[in-house]
Amino acid sequence: EKKKVFGLSFLSVFLWASAFPLTKVAQQQFTSIPLGFLRCTVAAIFLIIIGKCCHIRLPQKKHIPLFFVSGGLGFTGYMITFNTGILTLTSATSSIIIAVTPILTAIVASHLYKEKIKPIGWAAIAAAFIGVLILLLWEGVFSINIGLIWTVGAAIVFCGYNIMTRKLSAMGYNALEIVTYSMICGAILLGFWAGDGLHQLAGASVSHIIALIYLGALPSATAYFTWGKAMSYAERTSEVTNFMFVTPLLSTIMGFIILHEVPNAGTFIGGAIIIISIVVFNLKGK
């Protein structure tokens, strides 16, 4: 069981980490929001296939609006903000900002569900936000990279998705059902950009189409399935969630290998503060 948890968890974070540099590759021929539509559509198709094989249940009609809220936050809103943000960021910087999402989720959950956060947890949260400020202000107040603002927005909307996931889970839906129906709803909401997406798809090279299919099928579909499986085998949730800390490191390495990106000193300093804060928060803060 331990080996299964390790293997499935690592596979999930590896796939998620690869989405940062490969989104930048896909953006060489796709614009941000049409890319989001195509990625969500590919992911929805793959999740429907996985769901069929796993015999997932259909959602109740009265819950469909909740799936639209969930998909609107976690996939429509996330794709728009994430894809726009990463245009002007390195894979490393983007992945570090997104890594703050669990802390944002814990803050919201502490208010909604009255979950206690210890004083050391609040100290870790404060330190993480200092790390974000270092990233934002490293080049000076007047040269804040707008991509960072968009990516903080992506972390916030994904936090909203996490809270919705929890609500749907309490209603009896399992992880695969939640991500499948949320992804379908997210793709439908991105349908306004279907025309642009299909037009760009028709003119794209084979290598960029492969990058697009990879993004949809693996980080957006398979990784959620393997993450859910890892959770089901784990004795404690933290056995799985602690793997999230590896994502920025992996995406930095992949960004260097695939795109020859070299992060600036601000990314290393701010990033180190953020990652240490997240580790402390998860180990001691709750």
Locate predicted features:
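Hydrophobic/small/kink-forming positions within alpha-helical transmembrane segments
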Residues: 14-17, 21, 48, 72-76, ...
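Helix-helix packing/entry segments at the starts of transmembrane helices
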Residues: 38, 94-100, 165-186, 220-257
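Specific transmembrane alpha-helical segments of multi-pass solute transporters/efflux pumps
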Residues: 15, 19-20, 51-98, 134, ...
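Hydrophobic transmembrane alpha-helices of multi-pass small-molecule transport proteins
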Residues: 47, 68, 117-137, 155-156, ...
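C-terminal transmembrane-helix exit sites in multi-pass transporters
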Residues: 46-55, 101-126, 247-268
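Transmembrane alpha-helices of multi-pass small-molecule transport proteins
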Residues: 29-77, 104-105, 127, 157-164, ...
